[in-house]
């Protein structure tokens, strides 16, 4: 991450930057943490998605801050992480056929008895969740404004948190 953020810090001198990221492993890990403890209320997937957007955004911001300090420009560049929603169609086939891999890889033996929807990968079996096609970014105006203000914007983590608007 540090090497990537150094390159992005250099690119930001000439370009406006928007950073997106995946969150599958982090979402899966948080789900595993929740499932391993009955004393703590379980959070729904959209809350876990928001948690990981913040978690990964923090990691990116921290690495960017270090990169800009190394370049001697720590007070000149601004960046922000934005928890981001995306509008999806309630009839999207992604709800019936989950395809987004999250969490760790399982062997056949480890997967036995799991109640998750799993898919085969080159590294083993992996849990999958719904990943409907994003139709629009809810915070598109805010993202545009932040870009116009020369912020590096970190948004749409994990593809965004899906919402249905009627």
Regions found by a protein language model. Name each.
Residues 37-153:
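Ligand-binding beta-strand-loop-alpha-helix segment within the catalytic cores
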Residues 6-9, 21, 25, 29, ...:
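N-terminal, well-ordered alpha-helical segments
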Residues 1-20, 30-35, 145-148:
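N-terminal glycine-/serine-/threonine-rich phosphate-binding loop
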Residues 24-28, 87-90, 161-163:
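Short, active-site-adjacent cap segments at secondary-structure transitions
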Residues 16-29, 78-83, 153-156:
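Short beta-strand segments at enzyme active-site cores
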Residues 23-43:
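A short glycine/small-residue-enriched secondary-structure motif
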Residues 29-33, 91-97, 165-166:
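Short acidic, glycine/serine/threonine-rich loops at helix termini
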Residues 136-137, 152-166:
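Conserved mixed alpha/beta catalytic, RNA-binding, or beta-rich assembly cores of soluble enzyme
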């Amino acid at each position: 991450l540090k090497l990537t953020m150094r390159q992005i810090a250099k690119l930001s001198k000439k370009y406006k930057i928007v950073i997106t990221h995946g969150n599958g492993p982090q979402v899966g890990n948080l789900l595993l943490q929740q499932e391993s403890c009955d004393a703590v209320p379980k959070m729904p997937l959209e809350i876990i998605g928001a948690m990981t957007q913040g978690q990964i955004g923090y990691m990116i911001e921290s690495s960017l801050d270090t990169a800009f300090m190394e370049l001697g420009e720590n007070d000149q560049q601004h960046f922000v992480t934005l928890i981001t929603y995306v509008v999806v169609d309630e009839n999207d086939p992604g709800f019936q056929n989950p395809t987004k891999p999250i969490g760790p890889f399982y062997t056949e033996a480890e997967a036995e008895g799991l109640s998750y929807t799993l898919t085969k990968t080159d590294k083993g079996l992996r849990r999958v969740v719904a990943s409907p096609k994003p139709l629009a970014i809810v915070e598109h105006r805010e993202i545009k404004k932040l870009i116009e203000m020369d912020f590096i914007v970190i948004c749409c983590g994990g593809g965004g948190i899906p919402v249905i608007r009627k």
